[in-house]
Structures are given as structure tokens and as C-alpha cells.
Amino acid sequence: DYILIDCMPSLGMMTINALVASDTVLIPVQAAYLPVKGLQQLIRTISMVKKRLNRKLTIHGILLTMVDFRTNYAKDIASRVRETYGSKISIFENVIPLSVKVAEASAEGKVFIVIVQMEKYLWLMKI
């Protein structure tokens, strides 16, 4: 069984508490310069939490999100993440593509599941 703790993109007390309570971390990273730059600080924070507060904490992998492979920029960012972190941390081959449907679902408080093989979206109401 898995319990997902979805944290805000900050390194505040709530995120630290979530890391202390977790066994593993899945790191979603938006395919853009600033989120990738913040990834380094997050990895340092995870390392600090592991060293001082939660020795069993591991990084499950990095998942690229909001990827628009029509642009060279997104390809460059994805490549940079793989080159920089790929030897130390698993980088998922599948990505979450840039989609207005995802933004609309978030604004409406809905949960979404991307089924990559079928290239369709399955929408679920948030409970």
C-alpha cells in the first residue's frame, strides 16, 4: 500500500514533517529552469532529513512534469536533469506532458490520471 503526501513546492515545516514521516520520496519536477534549479536544494534537504531525522528515507525517483516536447527548451531541460542526476537518482522515462486539461482539473479541484499507453485522460472527482 502507498500513501501519497502531496506537499507544496517549498521547504517549510510541513514538507520537513512529510519527509520525516515517509519511507520514500517521488520528486515531480516541472520542465523549466527555476524548478530544476530548486531540485538541488530539495535533494540537499532530503539528504539532511535522512542523516538527522529519518535514516530509512530514500528517493524513489524524479518525474518530469509539464513537459512540452514540441520545444527544444523542454528537451534541453529533460536532458539536463538526466545528465545531472541520472547516475544517482532514477529518472522516470515516462513524463507528464504539458496539458491545459491538467490545469483545468486542478482549478476545478479534480484529480486526474494520465494513461500514457492510451494517450487519453481519465478524470475522477476528488473525494
Show the residue positions of the predicted features:
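Residue-level recognition of oxygen-bearing side chains
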Residues: 10, 101, 120
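C-terminal boundary of histidine-terminating zinc-finger modules
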Residues: 105-126
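Short, glycine-rich, amphipathic interfacial segments at transmembrane boundaries or analogous
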Residues: 98-104
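Conserved catalytic-core segment of NTP-binding enzymes
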Residues: 2-97
